[in-house]
Amino acid sequence: MSRMFGTDGVRGIANEELTAEVAYNLGKAGAYVLTEGTHKPKIVVGMDTRISGHMLESALVAGILSMGGEAICLGIVPTPAVAHLTRKYGADAGVVISASHNPVEYNGIKFFDKGGYKLPDELEDRIQSVIENNFEGVPCPTGEDIGEKTIIDDAIKDYIEFAKGTIKGDLKGLRVALDCANGASYKASVETFKDLGAEVYVINNEPNGKNINKDCGSTHMESLRKYVVEKGCDFGLAFDGDADRCLAVDEKGNIVNGDFMMAICAKYMKDHKKLDKNTMVVTVMSNIGLFIAMEREKIDLIKTKVGDRYVLEEMLKEGYKIGGEQSGHIIFLDYNTTGDGLVTALQLSSIIKDSNKKLSELASIMKELPQVLLNAKVTNNMKNIYIEDEEIAGEIKKIEEQMEGKGRVLIRPSGTEPLVRVMLEGENQEEIDKIAHDLVKLIEKKTK
């Protein structure tokens, strides 16, 4: 059987790939593996607003109870709320039913350990192994030993109080627009900003189970851009379906992506002596403009593979405080153990208020260099040709030398398709477009 777990838990089309049976098995195997079968597990369960969430929650919880576990059901809450509340409630694990920014037909199941961290590959593999071995040797409680379900109706209040505590002071005087993606942030983000005194304008906060991420949220920011200008807001903030990421819009309606947000936050943290080792962790997909800006600010950047789990790994290893991705997954380790859209939104808002500057002015800390991303079609066994072929390697080296540190070439094989992705950044869009197309042609010619 192929690996069930992807980079962010188990994901697929609900009721087709991610069936009730799969959810039941994951609940049962997860409850067993995460407590080593030594005691009755206590597992926190949360979900986003998808219509399939209730079906999968019922099955997942049945699996947990069948192992004698206690399922603490929080209802609809952001993914980072599950990470935080798993710790706060002293649970053995947390589970989120969500497919993040994906369309409504998808759903997913993701585990956190008792510390609120995403599971390492080894534990995920053990859960899969228990399922594949048909629960051989796994005890089957009966009678009084079967587990119980607890519902906490106001868990979101605990998360809101935690989030408010991540900034000093209030947000009075700020006029803020929020796009909740008809997702899990529809209560928490609005209540938090109102509690902190901001003047709040909201769109896409009427989830009906079917409209999550539909032309809204951090992956579709057109409506928020218009709304910010129309309402005369100081800035806008867009969450994705499970609210583990956040992107911003300045007062003119321009998108301020994760690279800009990280640059603003890292500089502020450094200026206030809160940036340990003057270092931030980013992925290889961050724009070279961020590297140029941070070098000017004397902030070191550590690069990881794409994926917030790799960013977190590096942060934990060296004790860095901030890291993230261009997509708006930003981790503030002083506050939470995973990307947290609401915490990110609050840090940025607090900086805007404290600095008394417009977001467009703060975002001028960096200049985003033009970028082009193309695919070269190759067979799966030829995905490393760009490393192995001397002519291709020589061409890449020549291009980078010509750019003199004001651009770069990034080539990486697709993990799922017979493609090599060719990304170029540089000062002139036309120039890099031509260079990228020529490089794709060369790679494809060499693989025929």
Curated annotation (Swiss-Prot):
Activated by phosphorylation. It catalyses: alpha-D-glucosamine 1-phosphate = D-glucosamine 6-phosphate. Its cofactor is Mg(2+). Pfam families: PGM_PMM_I (PF02878), PGM_PMM_II (PF02879), PGM_PMM_III (PF02880), PGM_PMM_IV (PF00408). One of its GO terms (biological process) is carbohydrate metabolic process. Binds 1 Mg(2+) ion per subunit. SUPFAM superfamilies: Phosphoglucomutase, C-terminal domain (SSF55957), Phosphoglucomutase, first 3 domains (SSF53738). This is Phosphoglucosamine mutase. It comes from Clostridium tetani (strain Massachusetts / E88).
